[in-house]
Amino acid sequence: MEEYQVYLELDRSRQQDFLYPFIFQEYIYGLVYGHDLNGSILVENVDYDNKSSLLIVKRLITRMYQQNHLIVSSNDFNKNQQFWGYNKNLYSQIISEAFAIVVEIPFYSQLRSSLEGAEVIKSYNKLRSIHAIFPFFEDKFTYLNYVSDVQIPYPIHLEILVQILRYWVKDPPLFHLLRSFLYQYCNWNSFINPKKSISSFSKSNPRFFFFLYNFYVCEYESIFLFLRKKSSHLRLTSFSVLFERIYFYAKIEHLVEVFPKDFLSTLSLFKDPLIHYVRYQGKSILASKNAPLLMNKWKYYLISLWQCYFNVWSQPGTIYINQLSDHSFHFFWGGYFSNVRLNLSVVRSQMLENSFLIEIVMKKLDTIVPIIPIIRSLAKAKFCNVLGHPISKPVWADLSDFGIIDRFLRIRRKISQYYNGSSKKKSLYRIKYILRLSCIKTLVRKHKSTVRAFLKRLGSEELLKEFFTEEEDILSLIFPRASSTLQRLYGGRIWYLDIIFSNDLVNHS
């Protein structure tokens, strides 16, 4: 019990005061105002001390201010007049952007210390890597029997995002300032169309919104993983230590009322160590090899958690539990599709004079090439038209020949590195053809020639040799050609370790 209490106890000494950095408002306004508001000011890999003092914050803001040379000169007087006097929305946006920069500093150090010190989070930290998703699907997923695709719901109101911060912040004026930012973009008292309000806010203030949303997901997953680790049965004693926290602990008694009380003695014998949890974008996957009864238990856990703690309305019918032997599961992450499909194999066996047929169902992880969404994205990026016919890229025509080829090569390599694992490569060849011909037409546009004349003049030159070289040839230069191991590796699944970003060309929203 003491172990649970230590983990769940809210450490008041680590709560943060956030308003004091705003005494350096001239630095903050200049820092954010001079930067592109549509971009992001990322503070990466900075070893912040856990003791974030006033002096540390002042030095950091001053250093960022000086490095970006964002001093507003007197020549910008007219523009500043419009900024300070008339454009209130931009004024609020600048303050909120600066606010997001400031509050990320102590939360970064606190999150890092939590990841280093809490045993509950340590095992989960390994799953934060993007690379861990692909081996999971390849090595684990095909051996599981039940899967549930869960859509993480958005909070019905932005006030819920603000309330989540109350567990970590003890500065009441901070929340008034926070609400004043949100009030600029949506009607605070309106519940008619919350999705539209959240969508408009996320577009106008992306960094600020993602800070709140990521904190919401982090809070949800921390509670979920605690339940996952500590509640291997449904006894009420497992949750008796949870009554300390605001809101959630006041309503946690509803969380254990998942099944009738007659089942409690039976369910206490079940263990569920094989519940796998994977989150990608705004969705998550629950998969298990056990009976569907345990999957139903966790489904109602999630429903009760969202309703009781986050006040998010979600119904059990929105979460479907499917059996992989009867259901082909589609997985989408960062612009990439994967599919677990079933292969039916018929084996003829003969025993003495009798022969019989045995049907074996095998699950196989296969990658799908979403040809229509990719062509739509290529057309949006001006590589082809809506019908998939390649066109030149005019904005790249001013680059050098090497620069043009290098940019096309990067895009093609990123797509090829993932989709080469697909068993159906016809669609992939079409994408490669579009990129190749678009590259040639861009070079033709630069040299003011025709495609036929350019290719004829190119002749024996090896300018496009790398672009037309397939990945099989590139791998054969790295490994021995006569190696049969290479053929077996390439014929199977190869997850390239440089797939660390989402596919920008595919946007399914």
Curated annotation (Swiss-Prot):
Gene Ontology CC terms: chloroplast
One MF annotation (Gene Ontology) recorded for this entry: RNA binding
Chief subcellular location: plastid
GO terms (BP aspect): mRNA processing; RNA splicing; tRNA processing
Keyword Secreted: no
The keyword Lipoprotein appears for this protein: no
Localization per record: Plastid, Chloroplast
Pfam family, one: Intron_maturas2
Keywords: Chloroplast, mRNA processing, Plastid, RNA-binding, tRNA processing
PANTHER family xref list: MATURASE K
Entry similarity comment: Belongs to the intron maturase 2 family. MatK subfamily.
Purpose of the protein: Usually encoded in the trnK tRNA gene intron. Probably assists in splicing its own and other chloroplast group II introns.
Xref: HAMAP family: MatK
Protein name (record): Maturase K
